[in-house]
From Swiss-Prot:
Positions that bind S-adenosyl-L-methionine: G115, V135, G136, D137, Y138, I139, L140
Enzyme class: transferase
Organism name: Rickettsia africae (strain ESF-5)
SUPFAM superfamilies associated with the record: alpha/beta knot
Protein name: tRNA (guanine-N(1)-)-methyltransferase
Keywords tagged on the record: Cytoplasm, Methyltransferase, S-adenosyl-L-methionine, Transferase, tRNA processing
Example GO biological process: tRNA N1-guanine methylation
Catalyzed chemical reaction(s): guanosine(37) in tRNA + S-adenosyl-L-methionine = N(1)-methylguanosine(37) in tRNA + S-adenosyl-L-homocysteine + H(+)
UniProt entry tagged with the keyword Lipid metabolism: no
Family: Belongs to the RNA methyltransferase TrmD family.
Amino acid sequence: MSILHATILTVFPEMFPGTLGHSLAGQALNKNIWSYDVINIRDFGLTKHKNIDDEAYGGGNGLIMRPDVLGSSIDHALALNPNAEMYYPSPRGRVFTQSFAKEMLKNKNLIFLCGRYEGIDERVIEEYNVKEISVGDYILSGGEIPTLTILDCLIRLLPGVLMNQNTLSSESFEEDGEFKGGLECSLYTRPEIWRDRAVPSVLLSGNHRLINEWKKEQSHMITKLRRPELLKDL
């Protein structure tokens, strides 16, 4: 049995596993560290045309995904994954962060409802206590790409996915990590000199105390310049 299971509701089932079938996530999928199933919302569509949307009450642009269609597809998903937490990628949602990812993993059974068109009927959110989640202040065509993004982040946190689990402690946004929730320092590798640009000499010194101090200073400087709001709790 896998550690994490995701049920994905979408009108484009062919988009999954997508990028999650490759690299670390793909290897973890093959090892059954995580698993998924996809439900095609259109299978629950109405009439011979499998309609899943309709015009908005009160007017406005765009079509709304119908609650009766979504309700039937969600009921099916819950039958497969009864104890799951349900998320709906939406620009109105709580912003997804590294700490939010860890919070999500307290429940290893997740359902992702991928919206399309103008959005979904609000009654669906109320009926199923759906949690809205945002990947940033911009608009995409649907919830599939945010779902792939969120799952990629979650999968990396699962035991056995990374060759060295300690890698997580030296990454950006890790509150208990090397950079205390700030951005990662600048990185360098061979060659020592490239196009007249040299690797900082401290990194070649072999003095681990000085190297660690340099990394922390770099992290603080970069965070202050690019994401100063991350420093408020540091």
